A protein has these predicted regions:
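N-terminal signal-anchor module of multipass membrane proteins
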Residues: 1-66, 70, 341-344
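Alpha-helical transmembrane segments in multi-pass membrane proteins
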Residues: 31-39, 54-66, 83-88, 92, ...
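Structural signature of hydrophobic alpha-helical transmembrane segments
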Residues: 48-61, 98-107, 200-214, 257-269
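C-terminal ends of transmembrane helices
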Residues: 64-76, 112-123, 219-227, 274-283
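Membrane-interface helix-loop-helix junctions at boundaries between adjacent transmembrane segments
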Residues: 84, 89-162
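Loop-to-transmembrane alpha-helix initiation sites
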Residues: 126-131, 260-267, 290, 308-321
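Long hydrophobic alpha-helical segments that form multi-pass transmembrane helix bundles
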Residues: 129-217
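A beta-strand-loop signature enriched in Asp, Gly, Thr, and Trp
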Residues: 235-238, 244-287
Length: 344
């Protein structure tokens, strides 16, 4: 007697999502990489070939570290999707232009292995990998991570060295550091020359190699908004909160009227708001949650910049709010159609 064969299933059961836009990880990563090309060109233009060597080292190290880590963990090797390349590029944009290539490679290792693969790979990490790599570098090598190179045009350097001794100009002549020194001078009734707002806007100032040129970053951010890869609520809420808090702080202390604009154009606020805080994995999933997340980012960044011991607060504020994201997603959720309020 022949065995009875079971009929073919008429219904295939699978998990959601059942309908999607057709976009893939590789396509999304290509769009983000494309949006960063203007900032990359600006970095090489202002800081020269040393900036390009740091960028190439970070990108190559990130790809190699991810491939080796996935091989050792017996996971599918996914370096072709571009996520490791993007992590390396974003990390490079947060580093000083003259950082040694060995430290750049170490930062990529920390970003990819500790920041992503240890948690299970892409989609499972709780921290932004690039900023985690930067934070580890800053904690481990503070002197090297706070040594800045002026752009090829010395006009901005001359403006900053008027506020600091010449021998300290390289290590402390970022706009935010100069602004912190200027605050002390203003409280004593002294006037201080700072880099102009136009120099801040165009990027002809000292700083991390990918954060100084505002037009290039805005161009990339607008492209991501147009392509639908990021939600406007995060960059708008983040930047708006920082501007409001610094404006009120400057008004209460009778600082110049452009004090808040200086904070807007200085440091890593623009790149952080458009490219770091909007990371799909580490940011909230709901619209209301993203607004709360952006508000928290702005408050933390402003507090660290205005009252903290370190003049820049973007990196740490994003890492802190990354930890808060699961809590936001837990209590700020969309109610399914037909469902009622959640009771616990």
């Amino acid at each position: 007697m022949e065995p009875v064969k079971a009929p073919a299933p008429l219904v295939i059961i699978s998990s959601s999502p059942y309908i999607h836009c057709g976009s893939t990880i590789s396509a999304a990563m290509r769009d983000v990489l494309l949006s960063l090309l203007p900032a990359l060109a600006a970095a090489v233009y202002f800081f020269g070939w040393s900036a390009l060597s740091v960028i190439l080292t970070c990108c190559l190290s990130a790809v190699i570290c991810e491939a080796l880590c996935q091989k050792l963990m017996q996971r599918p090797i996914t370096v072709g999707d571009g996520s490791a390349l993007l992590t390396g590029l974003l990390l490079a944009f947060c580093l000083p232009p003259e950082l040694s290539l060995g430290l750049a490679a170490f930062g990529s290792f920390c970003a990819v292995v500790i920041g992503k693969q240890v948690f299970g790979g892409l989609g499972s990490n709780i921290f932004n990998p690039a900023h985690l790599g930067r934070a580890i570098l800053l904690a481990s090598f503070p002197a090297q991570m706070t040594t800045w190179t002026m752009p090829w045009n010395t006009a901005a350097a001359e403006a900053v060295t008027k506020t600091t001794p010449y021998t300290d100009a390289v290590s402390s002549a970022t706009p935010l550091a100069a602004l912190r020194l200027a605050e002390s001078a203003w409280q004593r009734g002294l006037n201080v020359d700072l880099p102009s707002l136009s120099a801040l806007f165009w990027g002809n100032v000292g700083g991390s190699l990918g954060e100084t040129c505002v037009p290039a970053l805005l161009l990339g951010g607008i492209y991501l908004l147009w392509r639908g890869h990021i939600d406007w609520r995060i960059p708008a809420g983040y930047i708006g909160t920082v501007v409001v808090i610094t404006a009120i702080y400057g008004w209460l202390r009778e600082y110049p009227t452009w004090f808040a604009i200086y904070h807007l154009l200085s440091g890593g606020l623009i790149i952080g708001a458009f490219f770091m805080a909007t990371d799909w994995v580490t940011s909230p999933i709901t619209k209301k949650g993203r607004l709360i997340y952006a508000l928290g980012l702005g408050i933390l960044t402003a507090l660290i910049r205005l009252r903290g011991g370190y003049v820049e607060g973007v990196c740490y504020s994003i890492l802190i709010m990354n930890m808060v994201t699961p809590l936001i997603d837990r209590y700020v959720t969309n109610v399914p159609f037909g469902g009622g309020a959640r009771h616990e």
